[in-house]
Design a protein with these regions (language model features):
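Internal, well-folded beta-alpha domain core
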Residues: 67-192
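N-terminal, Lys/Arg- and Ser/Thr-rich interaction peptides
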Residues: 1-26, 177-185
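Beta-strand elements of well-folded, non-transmembrane domains
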Residues: 10-14, 58-60, 107-113
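Acidic, low-complexity glycine/serine/threonine-rich segments
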Residues: 30-34
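Short, well-structured hydrophobic secondary-structure segments
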Residues: 36-66
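Extracellular structured ligand-interaction cores
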Residues: 5, 51, 100-102
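Short acidic, gly/pro-rich beta-turn/loop elements at beta-sheet edges
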Residues: 18, 64, 115
Length: 192
């Protein structure tokens, strides 16, 4: 017997999922998958028992400048006026932001899907809000397997990448392999 899911699709105008390796890199593109701790955070925020699977698609990237301030404070003394000023150094970092991200979350029950369908999510940062759109869709496991998009298959092995540390498992390393079905860029444009 095949597993079936109740699928809620979230959409938004843009989204940036900060890679765990990017601290103050001059140019950083959004991660195109969700880590185990991100999914766990979403599960807790939605108040559901389980998020079984997900797929993430988008329409491409837009590089946008983001002004940041350093943690340190510079002290500057102007001797003529006997004036002391304090400033924080600024820099502009370029971010490759996903345009029109679509996040398909698969739930095991209609109850969890309905609960999720009434709430918004943030992909990673508070400003990257995605809202549920369209009806809750029933999908068999086979249909969901064919859904275009990218996801991280949570596993540790020779081909696995380290994708960060889990805030929910005492900082344990998280590993996975990227799983791409179809074209994750503009894959849903026709079906929106």
């Amino acid at each position: 017997m095949s597993t079936s899911y109740q699928v809620v699709t979230y959409t938004g105008p843009f989204g940036f999922i900060k890679p765990w390796t990017a601290v103050r890199d001059e140019l950083t593109y959004s991660q195109q998958f969700l880590t185990p701790s991100t999914i766990e955070g979403m599960r807790q925020k939605l108040g559901v028992l389980e998020i079984c699977r997900y797929r993430l698609t988008h329409d491409g990237f837009s590089v946008q400048g983001e002004t940041t301030q350093s943690a340190g404070i510079d002290r500057k003394t102007v001797k003529k006026r006997q004036e002391v000023t304090y400033q924080r150094a600024t820099a502009v970092l370029d971010r490759g932001v996903m345009l029109n991200p679509r996040l398909h979350l698969a739930f095991p029950s209609q109850d969890d899907a309905q609960k999720a369908h009434r709430q918004h999510l943030c992909l990673s940062r508070n400003e990257d809000v995605v809202m549920p759109g369209g009806p809750i869709r029933y999908r068999s496991e086979y249909e969901f397997n064919d859904t275009p998009g990218s996801k991280l298959r949570y596993e540790k092995g020779d081909d696995a990448l380290m994708v960060g540390y889990s805030r929910y498992k005492n900082g344990a390393p998280m590993y996975g392999t990227l799983d791409i079905t179809g074209d994750p860029v503009s894959a849903d444009r026709a079906s929106r």
